Design a protein with these regions (language model features):
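Loop/turn elements at helix/coil->beta-strand transitions in domains of secreted/extracellular proteins
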Residues: 9-15, 107-111
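A general structural signal for short secondary-structure junctions and capping/turn motifs
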Residues: 5-8, 102-106
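A Trp-anchored, charged/polar loop motif used as the substrate-binding/catalytic surface
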Residues: 1-5, 14, 94-98
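Glycan-binding loop/region signatures in secreted carbohydrate-active enzymes
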Residues: 20-103
Length: 111
């Protein structure tokens, strides 16, 4: 945010958006599902969204609940990712959005 302000963009022109989707990849090595795992390309589309490489938040949650995906949280990047069945998906959830909003509004020059 500070960089945009330094570039001359007034705070009143900056808005914060919330993404309720994830970007998904088919991984090359299913036994290695951490951040940075090699990807072969976009994962097949979700059951409802049907767009390769794109999962709706509800599809990610359903996959986690059904045990098809396992959620992990990257404390450095402050974002979750989920993996399973040769798929790796990065997304935002309540925890990551809470941390990002808190950071945006409590830094030295908050919005």
């Amino acid at each position: 945010m500070r960089e945009w302000e330094i570039a001359g963009i007034p705070k009143s022109s900056i808005s914060v958006g919330l993404a309720l989707y994830g970007r998904a990849w088919t991984v090359a090595y299913p036994d290695s599902m951490g951040v940075g795992v090699a990807a072969l390309g976009p994962a097949p589309g979700g059951a409802f969204t049907e767009e390769p490489g794109y999962y709706g938040f509800f599809e990610i949650c359903a996959g986690i609940k059904a045990g098809q995906l396992k959620r992990q949280f990257d404390r450095y990047a402050r974002v979750p990712h989920a993996s399973g069945q040769n798929i790796w998906v990065s997304y935002d959830d309540v925890e990551s959005i809470r941390q990002k909003v808190r950071k945006a509004y409590t830094t030295q020059n908050p919005l």
